[in-house]
């Protein structure tokens, strides 16, 4: 298991315990990647998972740059191209893990950002 998979597993456990349902893991396209695509009620949630051992440079959440946000939005647009039926509402969340790898703390930032260009 890679480090990224390990942190995604932590995030997935946290989100499913909160009632979200996994739709897809690691949606990749040439435009970007979404770590976890989850569903919360009628809302589709694109989740970016980040881990940082310490808080230097702003910590895990701060590492989701504007460029990364744009790539996530493009990857979600690609994901929705295959959607059947009315398009769902979409939200972009970040799960930031930090601290010791054995027991990282989890910070879930709901609606961490809007899709660039959406207002």
Residue spans of the language-model regions?
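Hydrophobic residues on conserved beta-strands that form the core of alpha/beta folds
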Residues: 22-24, 46, 92
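Mg2+/Mn2+-dependent nuclease catalytic core
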Residues: 53-76, 82
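Domain-level recognition of nuclease-like catalytic cores that cleave nucleotide substrates
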Residues: 82-119
């Amino acid at each position: 298991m890679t480090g990224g998979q390990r942190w995604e597993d932590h995030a997935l456990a946290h989100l499913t315990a909160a009632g979200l349902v996994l739709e897809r893991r690691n949606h990749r396209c040439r435009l970007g990647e979404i770590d976890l695509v989850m569903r919360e009620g009628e809302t589709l949630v694109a989740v970016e998972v980040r881990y940082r051992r310490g808080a230097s440079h702003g910590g895990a959440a701060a590492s989701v740059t504007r460029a990364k946000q744009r790539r996530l939005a493009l990857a979600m647009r690609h994901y929705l191209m295959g959607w059947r039926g009315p398009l769902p509402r979409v939200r972009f969340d970040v799960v930031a893990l930090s601290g010791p790898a054995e027991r990282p703390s989890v910070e879930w930032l709901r609606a961490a950002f809007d899709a660039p260009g959406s207002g």
